[in-house]
Amino acid sequence: MPDPRFFDSLGPALLSELAQAGAATLADAALGERVITHAAPLDASDAQAITFFSDAKRKDAAASTRAGACFVRPEHQGFLPPTCAALVTGRPQAAWAAAANRLHAPRRHEAGAPSLHPDAALEDGVALAPNVTIGQGASIGRGTRIGPGVVIGPGVVIGRYCRIGANAVIGFAMLGDNVAISAGAVIGEAGFGAALGPRGMVDLPQLGRVVIQDNVTLGANSCVDRGAFGDTTIGENTKIDNLVHVAHNVRIGRNCVLAAYTGVSGSTVVGDGVAFGGKAGVADHLNIGSGASIGAAASVFKDVPDGETWTGFPARPLKRWLRETAWLSRMAGGRGTRG
């Protein structure tokens, strides 16, 4: 269930209504009166949730889902348990997006509300520069200093003794104590998710949050996207440079450092004490082990074990990269060839 501090519930809705919204067909029309209250992922659903299944590799998750309903391709209906109503469509993700938008809406600043919402809670010693906007239900801890032009969305929690730079935007997020956010940083915007619908590409709703733990630094113009369902997490004492992008559902551990232009793709898990050189790129759904180092401009497409240093394109262990680079240098220079 999306966090009600950040998302308004528009439900419940009848299954027949959600099938129509997603341009899907109920496999069993008798289930059209089933009540659905929320959207959820396949493996974290309950009887009042609607989900989708589009990848046969996840058939085990489909077989064990507790969802009340699931958008599914015709050839995949048999993977669902009998308790889950099948909504048949050729585009399950796009259909689910339409249903999720019927059930949930991101909370935004109220039209005409004062810049400091009367329902926001500020502890003693909070310092606000000019032109700050703070939304309904936001909470800001003692001693926090907020720069000019900052926008803090409804429900956001900011701990004590934080420093928020000019024109930063923070939404759908919870920040710990002594967090430093530099100018122009954006926290909690929608992650990048899209699917092909009947009329072209559609955005997939992003119903998660951002959690930033104590003593984190986030550089200027860096972006941390909120999760698609769960949380995007930055661990304690992690330091992030300017112009870094952390995608949705990424989990970064404690005491990591990310240099400028680093990009970490969705759902990747980064252990503790990991270092990223400038312009490093990491593909989605990977695991970067604790104590690993990723070289500058490296492009990581595989899991990196604990404590290893990888670099290059595609990234590989440092010693292997050095051997290959030395060999290529010899070949390019003509040494080691005959004739």
UniProtKB/Swiss-Prot annotation:
<dbReference type="InterPro" id="IPR020573">
    <property type="entry name" value="UDP_GlcNAc_AcTrfase_non-rep"/>
</dbReference>
<dbReference type="GO" id="GO:0009245">
    <property type="term" value="P:lipid A biosynthetic process"/>
</dbReference>
<keyword id="KW-0808">Transferase</keyword>
<keyword id="KW-0677">Repeat</keyword>
<keyword id="KW-0441">Lipid A biosynthesis</keyword>
<dbReference type="Pfam" id="PF00132">
    <property type="entry name" value="Hexapep"/>
</dbReference>
<dbReference type="GO" id="GO:0016410">
    <property type="term" value="F:N-acyltransferase activity"/>
</dbReference>
<dbReference type="InterPro" id="IPR001451">
    <property type="entry name" value="Hexapep"/>
</dbReference>
<protein>
    <recommendedName>
        <fullName>UDP-3-O-acylglucosamine N-acyltransferase</fullName>
        <ecNumber>2.3.1.191</ecNumber>
    </recommendedName>
</protein>
<dbReference type="Pfam" id="PF04613">
    <property type="entry name" value="LpxD"/>
</dbReference>
<feature type="active site" description="Proton acceptor">
    <location>
        <position position="248"/>
    </location>
</feature>
<dbReference type="InterPro" id="IPR011004">
    <property type="entry name" value="Trimer_LpxA-like_sf"/>
</dbReference>
<comment type="function">
    <text>Catalyzes the N-acylation of UDP-3-O-acylglucosamine using 3-hydroxyacyl-ACP as the acyl donor. Is involved in the biosynthesis of lipid A, a phosphorylated glycolipid that anchors the lipopolysaccharide to the outer membrane of the cell.</text>
</comment>
<comment type="pathway">
    <text>Bacterial outer membrane biogenesis; LPS lipid A biosynthesis.</text>
</comment>
<dbReference type="InterPro" id="IPR018357">
    <property type="entry name" value="Hexapep_transf_CS"/>
</dbReference>
<keyword id="KW-0012">Acyltransferase</keyword>
<dbReference type="GO" id="GO:0016020">
    <property type="term" value="C:membrane"/>
</dbReference>
<keyword id="KW-0444">Lipid biosynthesis</keyword>
<keyword id="KW-0443">Lipid metabolism</keyword>
<comment type="similarity">
    <text>Belongs to the transferase hexapeptide repeat family. LpxD subfamily.</text>
</comment>
<comment type="subunit">
    <text>Homotrimer.</text>
</comment>
<dbReference type="InterPro" id="IPR007691">
    <property type="entry name" value="LpxD"/>
</dbReference>
